[in-house]
Amino acid sequence: MSLTPEQVRQVAHLARLKLDEDEMERMRLQLSSILDHIEMLQAIDVTDVPITAQVTDLTNVTRIDAVTSSLPVDAALANAPDRQGDYFRVKAVFEE
């Protein structure tokens, strides 16, 4: 499917793109190629292919959200280069 320069201008306008003539021609060729591939895909008979949302049959594996014991604060902060009370102290990232 070959697009006309006017069709490419319309797409560029809708996408709020400012294209010069060289870019317009390059886009025309690229978009035409993409549409050719889409036409090939549309020609494939998929009537016997089952509808799928995903192909791997994987599901999310989750765990029960339960409170459990964790690492004690002193053990967690044992190798911290700097701490303030029960917290890691780090250099400021944002200015105040």
Swiss-Prot record:
Q: Give the domain of life.
A: Bacteria
**Keywords, A to Z?**
ATP-binding, Ligase, Nucleotide-binding, Protein biosynthesis
Q: What is this protein called?
A: Aspartyl/glutamyl-tRNA(Asn/Gln) amidotransferase subunit C
GO BP terms, alphabetized:
glutaminyl-tRNAGln biosynthesis via transamidation; regulation of translational fidelity; translation
EC supergroup of this enzyme = ligase
Please give the PANTHER family that the UniProt record associates with this protein: GLUTAMYL-TRNA(GLN) AMIDOTRANSFERASE SUBUNIT C, MITOCHONDRIAL (PTHR15004:SF0)
EC no. given is 6.3.5.-
Q: Which organism is it from?
A: Herpetosiphon aurantiacus (strain ATCC 23779 / DSM 785 / 114-95)
Functional note: Allows the formation of correctly charged Asn-tRNA(Asn) or Gln-tRNA(Gln) through the transamidation of misacylated Asp-tRNA(Asn) or Glu-tRNA(Gln) in organisms which lack either or both of asparaginyl-tRNA or glutaminyl-tRNA synthetases. The reaction takes place in the presence of glutamine and ATP through an activated phospho-Asp-tRNA(Asn) or phospho-Glu-tRNA(Gln).
Oligomeric state and interaction partners are given as: Heterotrimer of A, B and C subunits.
Chemical reaction(s) catalysed: L-glutamyl-tRNA(Gln) + L-glutamine + ATP + H2O = L-glutaminyl-tRNA(Gln) + L-glutamate + ADP + phosphate + H(+); L-aspartyl-tRNA(Asn) + L-glutamine + ATP + H2O = L-asparaginyl-tRNA(Asn) + L-glutamate + ADP + phosphate + 2 H(+)
Q: What does the sequence similarity comment in the record state about its family?
A: Belongs to the GatC family.
| MF (Gene Ontology) | asparaginyl-tRNA synthase (glutamine-hydrolyzing) activity; ATP binding; glutaminyl-tRNA synthase (glutamine-hydrolyzing) activity
- Sorted alphabetically, which InterPro entries does this protein's record hold? Asp/Glu-ADT_sf_sub_c (IPR036113), GatC (IPR003837)
